[in-house]
Amino acid sequence: MQNQNFTATILVDQPPQEAFNAINNVREWWTGEPGVEGSTDKLGDEFIYRYKDLHYSKQKVTELIPGKKVVWLVTDSKLNFIKDKNEWTGTKISFEISDPDSDRENKTQIRFTHVGLVPGIECYGDCSNAWSSYINSSLRNFIAKGKNTNLSKQGVKSSVSE
């Protein structure tokens, strides 16, 4: 399917509000060199993510529903490892937080979607691999342990061609 946005879903043992708080503490799990600059936890906040001179993107927090949802709009991007360097500009990054089974206390599902990151674009392979690492390892560990234990600065390097 050429129009399918990249999605990753994880299940964590912490309650929805803890997951929400961890997602909004972006600099702790979306690592880079130098990483995240700016505020990330209030509606209207704008922040920049950088990884060396390979990736630059500016995000604006456009939706925050405590314990339920976080949405960022990518307002600017420069991906130096692909031909269309602005491929992310205008895309949206969404985290939907839910309790998939109300009988199981403290189980939370997080559905990550990068709206606009679809198989037909040049960045899809590298970017979906990087997002998979960030969501399945870095964010999951940060939610579970309060710190990022899996994804080092080198982790991105293997996902994005230099």
Give the location of each predicted region:
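Hydrophobic ligand-binding cavity/cleft-lining segments
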Residues: M1-G38
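Intrinsic-disorder/low-complexity, polar/charged segments enriched in Ser/Thr/Lys/Arg/Asp/Glu/Gln
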Residues: N3-T9, E46, Y56, K69, ...
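Hydrophobic/aromatic beta-strand elements that line small-molecule binding cavities or substrate pockets
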Residues: A8-I10, K58-E63, T91-D101
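Hydrophobic pocket/interface hotspot
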Residues: A19-I23, F47, V61, W72, ...
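Short amphipathic alpha-helical signal-transduction/dimerization elements
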Residues: N24-R27, I135-K147
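Glycine-rich portal/gate segments that line the openings of hydrophobic small-molecule binding cavities
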Residues: E28, P34-D84
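Beta-strand/loop substructures that line and gate deep hydrophobic ligand-binding cavities in soluble
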Residues: F81-S133, N150-Q154
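Short, highly charged C-terminal tails/helix-capping segments
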Residues: N141-E162
